[in-house]
Amino acid sequence: MTMTDASDLLSLSYSHYLARAAAARPALAERIAAWAAAPVTRAALDARLDELLAQGGQPPSEDALKKALRQLRGEAFGAVAERDLAGRADVAEVTGTMTDLAEAAIQRALALLAAELEAQYGEPRGPSGERLALGVVGMGKLGGRELNVSSDIDLIFVYEDDGETAGGARGPISVHEFFTRLGRRLIGVLSEATADGYVFRVDMRLRPNGDSGPLVCSLGMLEEYFYVQGREWERYAWIKGRLVTERASAAARRLAQQLDAIVKPFVYRRYLDFGVIGAIRSLHEQIRQEARRRATMRPDKADDIKLGRGGIREIEFSAQVFQLIRGGQDAGFRVQPTLAVLRHASASGLITEEVRAGLTHAYLFLRTLEHRLQYRNDAQTHAMPVDPAERAALAASLGFADYAALIDRLDQHRAFVEAQFDQVFADKADGGARREDDQAAGCIWSGALADDGADEALVARLAELGFADPAAVLARLQAVWRSSRYAGLPESSRVRFDRVAHRALEAAPGIDAAHRDETVVRCFDLLETVGRRGAYLALLTEYPAALRRVLSVLGATRWGGGYLIRHPQLLDELLDDEAIDSPFDWPAFKDALRRRLAAADGAEHQMDLLRHAHQAEVFRILLLDLAGRLSVEHVSDRLSELADAMLDVTIEVVWSQLAKRHRDTPCFAAIAYGKLGGKELGYASDLDLIFLYDDPDERAADVYTTFARRLITWLTTATGAGTLFDIDLRLRPNGEAGLLVTDLDAFRRYQLREGDAANTAWVWEHQALTRARYSAGDARIGAAFEAIRVQVLTTPRDAAVLAREIVEMREKVLAGHPNTTERFDLKHDRGGMVDIEFAVQYWVLLHAARHPEMIRNTGNIALLREVSRFGLMSEEEAETVGAAYRTYRKLQHRLRLDGMEKARVEPERVAAERQAVAALWARVFGA
């Protein structure tokens, strides 16, 4: 292409900057045309930089380096502009090329400048003599690979440790001094304005202590700064922090690994962190104030598509709030690009696909518009033009008929972004129509609680709110107000605590009178528990609906309230209606849990993740239960399925970490008995399990015993997140005297009584087998277990002998659960649940040989119907006894939710049910 063809390039006709550059450098137009034929890759940038540096002699001088980098920048800028204006490059290509340009410039400049300095002072070395490298952390859009075409670059310089250089033409200097000199020279090479322009403006203000801090900092200094002074806005900034220097050398790899270990816990909290909502809201308001101040000073810059309402920054904030809140628990949020964050938020159900698409389209439109504004004069501007000619050119470059059409589209996007931003960040804390201090709640939760002389007035106020025992409620409020926990809260947490306390008291009149006092007292128990974790107070402040649900749970169930107080991270579950309402999908649940475990930081974190995942699903089941959307049977089904899923994933993760493992997957299975086996699990039920293995390896017994011990530890150890399950292994062959894990063939012989008479199953063990099933682990062993179970249960038995042994076992159970009260124990007393279960087990063991349908583990009520079908009881009796069992289970379930350890009721409440069950027992066993 010749100069006469330069006008054919869209970039030269649109960009005043490129037109001037092409006039000063005739070969530029030809280079732009050649490069614009295809996307400009990192390899192309490196190759072109080699050519340009070779023109300046070897080794290239600093001046030659500056010239080459500036020429490369002009060519890349032109190629990107040409492809973009021609509609051949999308936003990702434009920002990717500019990011590659910045990284290539930084890495090449650093290598050449470091070599010069090392010739003078020697290589930088750490305390043990190891070579050290300067790490350049790209922040902001550089870190996110989202660099715009006229952006400055935000950098932070870090190095591994203090030390001294080895000495060269001059004597040694400190490592800190060496890297400071290197950093200063790098900044000069990139940002100094020469006759050829500049490469990138460099902004170092994000480093520790900003302009007043040292130019470079060691990792030790950075870690101390994060720990002592790190602020919320710096967490936000470091989300996009990324090393943009080379990663191949040993020094660079060490630095990257250590930097990640320091930054990750600073940015991503282990627990859900809702406190960042207020922090980002405050930061956004500061930015808006600065934007308004600039607009006042420069009215022509007032319409800012980056900092204005509905602009780029609001999209970035809307995405990154998810990272700060959830990135500690969900590694999928630890990504830099804004659109990748939105994709993960949508995949996680935190925003709808419609919202993700709307924000994505707005972001891409705004970034494209931003680039059009910047191509014009290579200016770092985000302001819409006021000059009519500039407006017309801008609209035409984007394919709009006129500027009004462009503004119409822009306003549509900005309105959508603004609405989504406000939905997340609008300050809901002060939304009441009246001042809290003027309300009854404000008068109660106040300094008056510290004044004994105010008790009478406070009791009267509490009575106005409808409390049955206002004096007792006052005593609890005073205890909290005067406690060291409350007094020691940081100011921001105390303000939030007070707001939630006011709201809880204001809500009292709307709470069921029978539970009002207890509900509010439990709420303050919860507030005391979460007070030290400002994030949970922030959640309750930011989301009033969450507090309403908390009060609903606390009022409806004592057990559920205690569960929430023990596991306050479950507060987050109250925000997600979609997750609560979504169908239970256990394969998807396990896959998501596996991904989170794979990204976890060690075994302790994995154990916490398992507990959090289990607790969240238990709580979801509880919320559906309290809403009347699950029957007692369905609650038990879901809890049992959840336990199976947790066991399956835990078996996998524990095996993967077992040093002794001799195969990729264990030939090992967990077999469920009791409530888990019968799918009648309650919220706080133990898991009755046995462990089987089937592995010919000579080390198998030792390996699986070690594995089982480790598995039990993972399931039962109390971590900061609580325990996963209580496990009962006494139903294994020979009970507590037996082996922890049992070989499958040995289990078969034990159950079929083929071995030593002293080592065979008792009748009660065969009773237990009627409710047993495969739960988790190797499905092949599960199928083999079921075959053994069928063989055992279909073995012919003597009716009289079987009846006698079952009656004797029933007496032992009764003796083991004495009831000295006048209330009826729904499970263990005569006429209760155990009588029904033993009768069903008797029929299964006696008649399964003739009626194999009876061995199906379908639950006691379904088995009663099977028994009636075979003529062993009438349909009427089956319905009556089945209804009694269902009534007992509902009552037991309700009492457990109310926090009762033993499920006992007034005898007259279940008189008819007891009579029906007693009649059944007498008919079957004659006793």
UniProtKB/Swiss-Prot annotation:
User: What are the EC numbers?
Assistant: 2.7.7.89, 2.7.7.42
Q: Any idea which UniProt keywords this protein has? A: ATP-binding, Magnesium, Multifunctional enzyme, Nucleotide-binding, Nucleotidyltransferase, Transferase
Query: Which domain of life does the UniProt lineage start with?
Result: Bacteria
**What cofactor does this protein call for?**
Mg(2+)
Keyword Isomerase: yes or no?
no
Pfam families associated with the record? GlnD_UR_UTase, GlnE
**Which Gene Ontology CC terms are recorded?**
cytosol
Q: Which Gene3D superfamilies match?
A: 1.20.120.1510, Beta Polymerase, domain 2, Nucleotidyltransferases domain 2
Its family remark reads: Belongs to the GlnE family.
Q: What does this protein do?
A: Involved in the regulation of glutamine synthetase GlnA, a key enzyme in the process to assimilate ammonia. When cellular nitrogen levels are high, the C-terminal adenylyl transferase (AT) inactivates GlnA by covalent transfer of an adenylyl group from ATP to specific tyrosine residue of GlnA, thus reducing its activity. Conversely, when nitrogen levels are low, the N-terminal adenylyl removase (AR) activates GlnA by removing the adenylyl group by phosphorolysis, increasing its activity.
According to UniProt, the name of this protein is Bifunctional glutamine synthetase adenylyltransferase/adenylyl-removing enzyme
Organism in which the protein naturally occurs: Burkholderia pseudomallei (strain K96243)
